[in-house]
Curated annotation (Swiss-Prot):
Domain of life: Bacteria
A family per Pfam: MGS
Family, per entry: Belongs to the PurH family.
Enzyme Commission numbers on file: 2.1.2.3, 3.5.4.10
Gene: purH
InterPro entries reported for this sequence: AICAR_Tfase_dup_dom_sf, Cytidine_deaminase-like, MGS-like_dom, MGS-like_dom_sf, PurH-like
Record's protein name: Bifunctional purine biosynthesis protein PurH
Domain MGS-like residue range list: 1-147
Reactions it catalyzes: (6R)-10-formyltetrahydrofolate + 5-amino-1-(5-phospho-beta-D-ribosyl)imidazole-4-carboxamide = 5-formamido-1-(5-phospho-D-ribosyl)imidazole-4-carboxamide + (6S)-5,6,7,8-tetrahydrofolate; IMP + H2O = 5-formamido-1-(5-phospho-D-ribosyl)imidazole-4-carboxamide
GO biological process: 'de novo' IMP biosynthetic process
PANTHER family attached to this UniProt entry: BIFUNCTIONAL PURINE BIOSYNTHESIS PROTEIN ATIC, BIFUNCTIONAL PURINE BIOSYNTHESIS PROTEIN PURH
Amino acid sequence: MAKIKRALISVSNKRGIIEFSKVLAGYGVEILSTGGTAKLLRDSGVDVKDVSEFTGFPEMLDGRVKTLHPKVHGGLLGMRGNPEHVAKMREFGIENIDMVVVNLYPFEATVAKEGCLLVDAIENIDIGGPTMLRSAAKNYPDVTVLVDSVDYATIVDEMRENGGEVSAKTNFGLAVKAFQHTAAYDGAISNYLGARLGEGVDPFPPTFTFQVRKSQELRYGENPQQSAAFYVERDQHEASVATCHQIQGKELSYNNIADTDAALECVKQFTEGPTCVIVKHANPCGVAIGSSLLEAYDRAYSTDPESAFGGIIACNRELDLETARAICERQFVEVIVAPTASPEAVQVVSSKKNVRLLVYGEWPQTVVPRLDFKRVTGGLLVQSADQELFKNLQVVTKRQPTPEELIDLQFSWRVAKFVKSNAIVYGRDGMTIGVGAGQMSRVNSARIAAIKAEHAGLVVEGAVMASDAFFPFRDGIDNAASVGIRAVIQPGGSMRDAEVIAAADEHGMAMVFTGMRHFRH
């Protein structure tokens, strides 16, 4: 146990600090502080000694040097049980500091502001704060270090239970948190400055640092022989699988999380009406828009009832009673995810205790740029996320698509973006008719889409086709025409585009180029 007799407090985030300081003062703790924190505490009736008075050395260089002094760091690093340390501290008049409460200059918040200049960023790089945190954390058996106001209550409770003392176990956990905090802080600085080594801003600096936090231990990974955990990024607020709230059901598995991510990101593409996406093994097997969520689910399910078994269902509207009842009565489902769920829907789903029900809230219509990461042996592939749909829509055939066909082409194109390559999607009237995924040849994906439609009893005649990448040969067009496809949307860009367009003209099909590919591996 470490008895708290003296604490150094210097915080940029003042939340809860007055109340916490008053508790410390109630235990007779001497409080050292600097600048704005010292003024706030004094104004609130807390007795405070300035760090400059404690060290006998004034603040200098416009406040850049406040706590960088042997009396501060000696007081933090000196080991109480080491006679040599104790003797040396006595020789130089260094007194123990038993607690450090510090959070750092808001560097990330500063650089996130539009128009932030380099000089502003530099002035918000904290030097003394991280140095104190590291000193205190290194000497955790004797020093309590706090970087997060969330932990104030825990320390207050422990001090009350132990007569003003804090356990080494608690101190160790707080020390780990402090090192995590300074690592993330330095990483943010390194990323920001590294991106500005040359002219302009490089999105891929020479080194890249990011920190994730463990959210959940998983029973196993993609397969039972693999161990796994789910980590989430810091300060995430966007509606995503990482920020979903689980209302009921078993713990999410590794595959549940991966598939829910695919389903949720797909359904977020659709805002024009109630939409349902059913995903299996990270591929949409049914997507549909309806006049109601129930109709959207019915239509999505009808695309491929076999593959929907054990799938993930994502909705872009509140899960209502009728839709929840239809899902639970009709199929085995692993996860249902929606912006919200009505109390009646929650009650229905609760009858299936293993079904995981997640809500993700509303999501912004504006796209927030982000990076995607893919691990390869010995390295990491980093790219900007594929967040655009097309460059422009260009009709390249003699026949123009009808207004109805154009709507279906754009619907099917959005679905194809989320299907594993090579991806082919047949669609009509705002629903998928057949999905061909993950084949090594594009024509085979087209054949599978037709087979899926036939097995589901759906009519392909008059439907449209979306392809995530160009057709290298005309065979994909010939195959589509043979089953009744009337219009095609694809990126274009093949050496044989002219041959492919000619094939579409021969069959009286309309074809639209998007100028943008959507490979998904």
